[in-house]
C-alpha cells in the first residue's frame, strides 16, 4: 500500500495558492511531450500522438514501455529543490515547499518521516512531480527532437528517430530505429534517470515491444493488425480495464443491494456505463463497449429477480430493445413505468479520432492555457495612469507562446527577447508603439 499524505484543509488552501502561482510559470517550461496534470491536456492527447506515429507513413513501430519504480515515493528532495531554485528566487517559497515535502505521513496511527518522495494526496504534489520529470523531458527533447531535415538525414544514414510521450510517471518512447538502436536508447534512458534524477526503471515492466505485438498505455491496448488485407492500428480497452468496470457493476448488482429502489440503481449503472463508454469512445471496435453494456443489462435483470424473489409477473413485464434518436436502448417495463439502460453503439470509432480535437491540437500545437488565444480579440484592461496590469510580466515572460511560429521557441531565446523589450521600455524603437512587439536583429540576416 502507498502511504498517503493528505493535508488538512488549512494546508490544502495554502498549497492551492502556491500551485496557482507556480503553475503558470512552469507551464512555460514544460515540454510538449508531457500530458499529465496539465491544464488543457488529457490522456487522449497522448493517445492521438501515438496513433499518428504508429501509422504506415511514420512507421514508429518499436515501443519502449517505461515504468519507474515507485516514482512518487522516490523523488529525491534535494534534487527537486535544486531544480526549483532555477526558477524560484524567493527563499520563503522554497522553505514552504521543503516543509510540505518533510511533513511525514501517519501509518497505523504512527508518524513516519518522509525522506524521499512527494506526498500523494497533496494539492501541489502533481505539479512537483511534473517539475521533477521535466528534466527527463528536456533531455529527451535535446537528444531526439530534431528538425525534419535532421530526421531525414538520420534515416538515410540507417539510423532511427525517437519520440517521447509522458503522462505523469507513465511514458512510452516510440522509434523507427532497429532493435539494436532501441536497446541502446533504453539503456541511455536508464542511465540518465539513475545518474541525474536518482530514479530506477523496473526491469520487469520496462519492455521493448513491437507494435504488431501490442502494448498498454493509459488504459488502452494499441496494436497493429491486418484484419482485411491492410495494416491498421487498433485502439481498444485493456482487459484489465474491462474487468475493473465489470467488478464495479457486480458489486452494485449483488444481493446485498436489493433493498434499493430500481430506478435509483439503474441511474447509478447508467452513470458508470456512460463514463466508461465516453472514455473509450474512440476505440476501433465498438464490440468492447457493447460487451460492457450487455453485461450491465443482464446483471441488472438478475438483480431485479433477486430483489423480488424471482417473481417476474409482478415486477418485470418485458425486456426489449428500441431505437430512440438513432440510439439503441434496452428498456424494462416495471410496474408504473419503463427503465432504460443507455447503450453507446452510436459513439464515434477510432476513424473519427483523426478529425477530432485531439489530433488538431497535436498538429497545430497546444495553446498556452494562461495566455489569451491568439485568434481572440480580448480588449485591453484599463488601469490607473502610471500602473500596469498584474499579468504584464507573465505575458511578456512567455514571449512567443501565442504565435504559431514561435510556440516551441527555446526558453533561452524567449528570455533574450524579454530582456531586449525591457531594455527598450516595451516600446518599438522605430514608431514608439507598445502593441504587438516583436524582437529582431539590429541588422537583418539572410533568414530574417
Features from the language model and the residues they span:
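Histidine-centered nuclease catalytic patch
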Residues: 404, 429-448
Amino acid at each position: 500500500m502507498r502511504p498517503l499524505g493528505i493535508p488538512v484543509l488549512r494546508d490544502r488552501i495554502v498549497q492551492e495558492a502556491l500551485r496557482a502561482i507556480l503553475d503558470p510559470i512552469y507551464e512555460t517550461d514544460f515540454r510538449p511531450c508531457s500530458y499529465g496534470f496539465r491544464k488543457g491536456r488529457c490522456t487522449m492527447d497522448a493517445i492521438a500522438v501515438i496513433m499518428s506515429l504508429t501509422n504506415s507513413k511514420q512507421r514508429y513501430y518499436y515501443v519502449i514501455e517505461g515504468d519507474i519504480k515507485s516514482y512518487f515515493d522516490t523523488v529525491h528532495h534535494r534534487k527537486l529543490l535544486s531544480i526549483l531554485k532555477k526558477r524560484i528566487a524567493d527563499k520563503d517559497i522554497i522553505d514552504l515547499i521543503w516543509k510540505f515535502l518533510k511533513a511525514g505521513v501517519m501509518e497505523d496511527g504512527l508518524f513516519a518521516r518522509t525522506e524521499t518522495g512527494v506526498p500523494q494526496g497533496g494539492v501541489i504534489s502533481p505539479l512537483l512531480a511534473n517539475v521533477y520529470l521535466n528534466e527527463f523531458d528536456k533531455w529527451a527533447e535535446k537528444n531526439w527532437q530534431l528538425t525534419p531535415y535532421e530526421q531525414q538525414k538520420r534515416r538515410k544514414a540507417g539510423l532511427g528517430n525517437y519520440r517521447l510521450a509522458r503522462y505523469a510517471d507513465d511514458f512510452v518512447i516510440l522509434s523507427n530505429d532497429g532493435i539494436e538502436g532501441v536497446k541502446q536508447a533504453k539503456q541511455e534512458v536508464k542511465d540518465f534517470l539513475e545518474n541525474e534524477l536518482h530514479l530506477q526503471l523496473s526491469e520487469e515492466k520496462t519492455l521493448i515491444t513491437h507494435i504488431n505485438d501490442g502494448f498498454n498505455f493509459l488504459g488502452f491496448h494499441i496494436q497493429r493488425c491486418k484484419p482485411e488485407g491492410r495494416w491498421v492500428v487498433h485502439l481498444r480497452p485493456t482487459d484489465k480495464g474491462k474487468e475493473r468496470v465489470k467488478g464495479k457493476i457486480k458489486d452494485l448488482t449483488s444481493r446485498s443491494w436489493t433493498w434499493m429502489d430500481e430506478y435509483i440503481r439503474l441511474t447509478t449503472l447508467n452513470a458508470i456505463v456512460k463514463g466508461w463508454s465516453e472514455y473509450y469512445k474512440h476505440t476501433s471496435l465498438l464490440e468492447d463497449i457493447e460487451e460492457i453494456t450487455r453485461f450491465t443489462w443482464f446483471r441488472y435483470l438478475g438483480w431485479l429477480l433477486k430483489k423480488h424473489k424471482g417473481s417476474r409477473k409482478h415486477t418485470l413485464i418485458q425486456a426489449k430493445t428500441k431505437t430512440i434518436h438513432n440510439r439503441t436502448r434496452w428498456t424494462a417495463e416495471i410496474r408504473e413505468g419503463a427503465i432504460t439502460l443507455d447503450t453507446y453503439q452510436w459513439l464515434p470509432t477510432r476513424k473519427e479520432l483523426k478529425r477530432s480535437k485531439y489530433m488538431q491540437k497535436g498538429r497545430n500545437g497546444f495553446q498556452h492555457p494562461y495566455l489569451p488565444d491568439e485568434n481572440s480579440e480580448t480588449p485591453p484592461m484599463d488601469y490607473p495612469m502610471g500602473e500596469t496590469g498584474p499579468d504584464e510580466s507573465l505575458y511578456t515572460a512567455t514571449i512567443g507562446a501565442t504565435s504559431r511560429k514561435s510556440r516551441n521557441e527555446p526558453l533561452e531565446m524567449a528570455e533574450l527577447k524579454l530582456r531586449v523589450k525591457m531594455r527598450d521600455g516595451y516600446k518599438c524603437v522605430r514608431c514608439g508603439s507598445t502593441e504587438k512587439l516583436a524582437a529582431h536583429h539590429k541588422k537583418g540576416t539572410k533568414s530574417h
